[in-house]
Amino acid sequence: MKLAAFPKCFMDQLVVERSMSLFDWIAMASDLPVEGLEFHHGFLETLDEAYLEGVRSALERRHLQMPMLCASPDFTKPDPEERHREVEREKRLISVTAFLGGSYCRVLSGQRRPEVSREQGALWVVESIRELLDYAAEKGVVLAMENHYKDNYWTHPEFAQRREVYLEILNQIDSPWLGAQYDPSNAILAGEDPIELLELVKRRVVTVHASDRFLKPGHTLEELRSVEDSAGYAAILSHGVVGQGLNNYPRIFRMLREAGYDGWISIEDGINGLGEILESAEFLRPLMQGQVKRPPETPRPRNPQPGG
């Protein structure tokens, strides 16, 4: 397995404010104990070839790979012309992935719009993804459908956030060019068991997000549900250092290895800076190598007395 980093701590600086360039992030990340960097499509200032060539050169100078591009297509838009534009935009990002040397490009279902039924939305999503498969094959890029919560810059949460909808879409498309991007924290946010989801998709996992989200003290999942349909992430939701949250990562990695997974693990962390990404990397590396840390045993008293 190889380790990549995704900088949640710098999302707005890279995407919205543009106070940090992608080249700045590549330089900063070169000191992290990772082999690659996962990019969000919003990190790219332009898709012009000259700019992309500069990005590729910067990665090469720092001996870093760009294995996976985090794209956010929205295939539940009711207007067919808008859905077509989303398909064409995703194709462009597949091409960018290949140009930068990546092998995986994220694909999503889209936003869970109140006016779109489950049946209609699933139909649109399956149709849209199928339109991408031949192009993905041509470029040698596998589409990775994430069990997603919500893009940072969406209004509504993921249409396929719930497991049954996610699997309904994924299982309709039997292609080597579509796999699962597994994120255990997103399953928890959906009110579901991440281990149960992994058991169902483990043979199709092509990329993994390592994250540990948590609700800020005093807040509940029910409260999160009530504020999901607003722009961006809820203020009560936060990322934490991987290994310090609710996910059972030793078990997750054991299941991945048993399924033959040997791909990329991308740290989705660092909300409070690079130090947290480093902590996450130090936690994950032994698990990736098959080393499971066991809790220390509680010392037992010698020669216990009856009733003692």
Stretch-by-stretch model annotation:
Residues 1-33, 160-308:
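Histidine-acidic metal/acid-base catalytic patches
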Residues 1-103, 120-130, 137, 175, ...:
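N-terminal pre-domain/capping segments
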Residues 9-11, 41-43, 72-75, 109-113, ...:
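Active-site-proximal loop/turn and secondary-structure-junction residues that shape catalytic pockets
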Residues 11-14, 74-80, 113-117, 151-156, ...:
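A short acidic, helix-capping loop that chelates divalent metal ions and anchors anionic groups
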Residues 97-118, 139-152, 266-267:
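Active-site groove signature of glycoside hydrolases
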Residues 116-129, 153-160:
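Active-site cleft segment of glycoside hydrolase catalytic domains centered on the general acid/base Glu
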Residues 138-174:
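Basic- and aromatic-lined ligand-binding clefts that recognize polyanionic substrates
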